[in-house]
Amino acid sequence: MFPRRPPATLAAWLAGARGGGLLSALANQCRFVTGLRVRRAQQIAQLYGRLYSESSRCALLGRFWRRLRGRPGHASVLMAALSGVFVWDEERIQEEELQRSINEMKRLEEMSNIFQSSGVENYPPEPKSPAGGNEKSKDKEEPWEMVMDKKHFKLWRRPITGTHLYQYRVFGTYTDVTPRQFFNVQLDTEYRKKWDALVIKLEVIERDAVSGSEVLHWVTHFPYPMYSRDYVYVRRYSVDQENNVMVLVSRAVEHPSVPESPEFVRVRSYESQMVIRPHKSFDENGFDYLLTYSDNPQTVFPRYCVSWMVSSGMPDFLEKLHMATLKAKNMEIKVKDYISAKPLEMSSEAKATAPSPERKNEGSCGPARIEYA
């Protein structure tokens, strides 16, 4: 159609009037085709919305998503964005993430027992990895630095490689509340709105029927003169009665139902892992906990200012959580029990029969394991 031209000549021709007109025509054609396909997709979505229930639509979209995942490029991401669907296959918290947090607690306990038996009371912040571990990954991790050392509260931090941020780790003990009470108060979003004065908004956006993960939107006040921050994150917890341990893992995600608001600063980098080890049982006073935390609050303040805010804010939050647990215990405030017997019974029934698609998460739990969020 066009004569062959050298690249430089072609670029000059496209920059001219005739070339500009051609590019404009191509752009208009692309906009027309894209708009037509988006309208067709919306019409199809409305049709399926009338024909199928919400659970059926989610299952259908899930199958469609799995087919798209094998295609090259960003077709699957684009389709998820256009349809306003949160892709659980990519974002749910996996069993491996929960187990990694529990393993960190075990390593810390093993090393602290060695130190105590040798007459040293300090808890080591970073136990050595087992022999044969990945040496490269160890080299990339910075050493932990003690920030606060009290009898029942120890706080460390370490730089996150390639950033100006720190990761924080707390190892602590409470002896006047039960693990069940402490765990339930931490998970109960409605009760937190009452005891945490910094909360502006806290609600569950979506739940995953497969893993029990939840997506939450949390808006919180930050110290003056900073703007309030908002977090969109997925969380999942697991309670292992056989091994006497409970774990809660959270991390930031993007969700189409919660677009960024100009009123708040969106925190896009956030991770938290809490592991609780009862001294005796879930319903007797006394437990140890390990909290590992990091986030990027998107501030312009120097690194030492941010570190000071987190280092002082973390003990304050944990003490408020502890006091809220005591208040709920002493005043018999009703708090949702996340460690109920019902999920355990359902899990045992599912194990005895062939698991159905709707009960994958129940069938995958052991007879002495509760898992829900």
From Swiss-Prot:
Keywords: Coiled coil, Mitochondrion, Transit peptide. Its main location: mitochondrion. Expressed in epithelial cells of airways, peripheral bronchioles and alveoli, as well as in the basal cell layer of the epidermis (at protein level). Disruption phenotype: The viability of homozygous knockout embryos is dramatically decreased after 10.0 dpc. Surviving animals have a normal life expectancy, but males are infertile. Ovalbumin sensitization and challenge of heterozygous mice results in a significant increase in pulmonary inflammation, mucous cell metaplasia, airway hyperresponsiveness and ovalbumin-specific IgE compared with wild-type animals. This exacerbation is associated with an increase in CD4(+) IL13(+) T helper cells, as well as an increase IL4, IL5 and IL13 cytokine production in lungs. The record marks 80-81 as: Cleavage. Proteolytically cleaved by PARL. Pfam families: START. Residues 115-330 form the START domain. Residues 118-141, 347-373 are annotated as: Disordered. Residues 1-61 form a transit peptide. GO terms for cellular component: cytoplasm; extracellular region; mitochondrion. PROSITE patterns: START. CDD domains: START_STARD7-like. GO terms for biological process: establishment of skin barrier; inflammatory response; mucociliary clearance; myeloid dendritic cell activation; type 2 immune response. InterPro entries: START-like_dom_sf, START_lipid-bd_dom, START_lipid_transfer, START_STARD7. It is found in: Mitochondrion. May play a protective role in mucosal tissues by preventing exaggerated allergic responses. This is StAR-related lipid transfer protein 7, mitochondrial.
